[in-house]
């Protein structure tokens, strides 16, 4: 992790790390899981542990001690961010999914292929946004699609 942070800082780029998300992995995912606090501990010599205001992004940003940038940590399991998440995901097969950790998708592909109007498409997008949860869960639902099938 430190090497990637140094590389990004040398180019004035932002690097973001995401916790392993247990999609279709079964119980062994915990062997590879690294929570945010452990990521911060591994980067303690490079990153100020005081979070910056991240707004509505899933990432929480931390300033580099050398002043040459920031590091983002996306922590859906150890530090859920559902209340401030502004993301939707368009799946590989044409569905709009409001939350990776909840069932429920809105089909866009069929509407687009049928020549739906801009207003009809906007209504479908609003429907998906309305399906975003205010609070999250630490695991995707049983039988959840893999990230490959979701388009991630």
Predicted stretch roles:
Residues 1-72, 110:
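Radical SAM enzyme [4Fe-4S]-AdoMet core and its adjacent flexible, acidic
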Residues 19, 75, 100:
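Short secondary-structure boundary segments
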Residues 22, 78-79, 102-104:
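Short, solvent-exposed loop/turn segments at secondary-structure junctions
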Residues 83-152:
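Flexible mid-to-C-terminal extensions adjoining Fe-S/redox cofactors in radical SAM and related proteins
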């Amino acid at each position: 992790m430190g090497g990637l942070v140094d590389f990004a800082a040398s180019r004035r780029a932002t690097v973001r790390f995401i916790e392993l998300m247990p999609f279709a992995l079964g119980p062994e995912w915990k062997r590879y899981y690294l929570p945010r606090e452990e990521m911060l501990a591994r980067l303690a010599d490079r990153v100020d542990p005081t979070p910056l205001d991240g707004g509505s992004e899933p990432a929480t940003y931390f300033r580099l001690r050398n002043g040459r940038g920031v590091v983002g940590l996306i922590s859906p399991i150890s530090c859920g961010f559902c209340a401030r998440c502004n993301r939707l995901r368009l799946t590989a097969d044409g569905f709009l999914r409001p939350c990776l950790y909840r069932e429920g998708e809105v089909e866009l592909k069929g509407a687009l292929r049928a020549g739906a109007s801009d207003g009809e498409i906007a209504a479908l997008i609003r429907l998906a946004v309305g399906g975003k949860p205010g609070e999250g869960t630490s695991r995707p639902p049983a039988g959840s699609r893999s990230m490959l099938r979701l388009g991630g």
